[in-house]
Regions:
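Helix-coil-helix junctions within alpha-helical repeat/solenoid scaffolds
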Residues: 1-136
Length: 136
């Protein structure tokens, strides 16, 4: 059913924001399956980002980065700037898990902040500013 996309997208996205690994592992694969079945690229990108965050939280860093990059590529092709910025933020978070990647984390957070400011996504922009301040 069409509304299943919205339900699983909301559940997966909320689990991602809450950093709830078990919920991400439960809902993100279902969202991915529905999005692939129905060729819904936006929801597929959201599923890939959620899976990437789940993999990062689970210590699967190589797989995580690949999923996040896939999501960013999809959102870029769609011109979905808010989703692009949210994914750039997650790539910044990913880089924070790698001690030698602080410079790259700053770059991703800065790119995310630029997009958040451009679209006036104030709460996201403030969260990103906080992440940047934490790097100082």
């Amino acid at each position: 059913m069409a509304h299943d996309h919205e339900i699983f997208m909301t559940l997966a996205d909320t689990a991602m924001e809450m950093r709830d690994l078990s919920a991400l592992q439960e809902y993100a694969p279902s969202l991915q399956e529905l999005a692939e079945r129905d060729r819904h690229k936006l929801y597929l990108g959201i599923a890939l980002r959620a899976l990437g965050v789940a993999q990062r939280l689970d210590g699967k860093h190589i797989e995580s980065k690949a999923r996040l990059k896939q999501a960013l590529d999809l959102f870029t092709k769609l011109g979905a700037r808010w989703q692009m910025a949210r994914t750039l933020f997650e790539l910044g978070e990913w880089n924070l898990t790698q001690p030698e990647k602080k410079v790259q984390a700053r770059e991703y957070f800065s790119l995310a902040l630029s997009l958040f400011d451009e679209i006036q996504a104030v709460p996201n922009a403030e969260r990103t500013r906080e992440a940047l301040r934490s790097l100082d």
